[in-house]
């Protein structure tokens, strides 16, 4: 187990990618505190993992809730080795022209307060514990932090902001805390949209992402949640990633190497190599 006796705090760990990260960290030997807005999901986590998981109900837009999570994590587990700011919402790729004039202020505030401010507040609250443990932060970014059309201007702008946050905090917190980011691609989860745009009850799983991504990803299919979690384990380990801070891992199925005319360039490799 790569994370034996380590302690992590994950925001938005009650569902989706966050839940998969929690499950993987526990399997790797870690104890995990989870800050999530859903009491029901936290109860499910604790039922699944028992004393290895501590659930804290709260809002990632509120510093006091992050401080409570950090405080309760340290009280229960003695330390924080790794912080994973992960809670987020998606704007369902709504173009600027389609955002209603009377909702754009609220939509901007909602997306940026959850997807950017929520990350910054998490680091602020956990920083003393992370410095004490000489720990690390692993941000969840997105392919939208690097390429267009992974969201609308609200989501894409927010994820680009997180890229800048990784780099700045990697500088500011060195040499005491390592800061890195994982930019996963699409996956079918319960990721919701902004309430200000009437999308609070809409889940990304309602979009046929699997069909859409299979033809455009060089890896040939849409990854499932669990397949993204190894990158978080890698960045959280102390021995293998001691030299690594300020790193941004494009963990998206190869979006950056798609060809202009075809997503993949090696479909006929087995034939050329006479393997079939």
UniProtKB/Swiss-Prot annotation:
Any GO MF annotation of the entry: cis-2,3-dihydrobiphenyl-2,3-diol dehydrogenase activity
Keyword Oxidoreductase: yes
Family indicated by similarity: Belongs to the short-chain dehydrogenases/reductases (SDR) family.
Chain segments annotated as transmembrane: none
Single GO BP term: catabolic process
Enzyme Commission number(s) of this protein: 1.3.1.56
Coiled coil ranges: none
Residue numbers binding substrate: 142
Keywords: Aromatic hydrocarbons catabolism, NAD, Oxidoreductase
Positions of the catalytic residues: 155
Pfam families: adh_short
Keyword ATP-binding: no
UniProt name for this protein: Cis-2,3-dihydrobiphenyl-2,3-diol dehydrogenase
Amino acids binding NAD(+): 9-33
UniProt-listed InterPro entries: BphB-like_SDR (IPR047950), BphB_TodD (IPR017711), NAD(P)-bd_dom_sf (IPR036291), Sc_DH/Rdtase_CS (IPR020904), SDR_fam (IPR002347)
Annotated catalysed reactions: (2R,3S)-3-phenylcyclohexa-3,5-diene-1,2-diol + NAD(+) = biphenyl-2,3-diol + NADH + H(+)
Pathway this chain belongs to: Xenobiotic degradation; biphenyl degradation; 2-hydroxy-2,4-pentadienoate and benzoate from biphenyl: step 2/4
Upper classification of the organism: Bacteria, Pseudomonadati, Pseudomonadota
Superkingdom classification of source: Bacteria
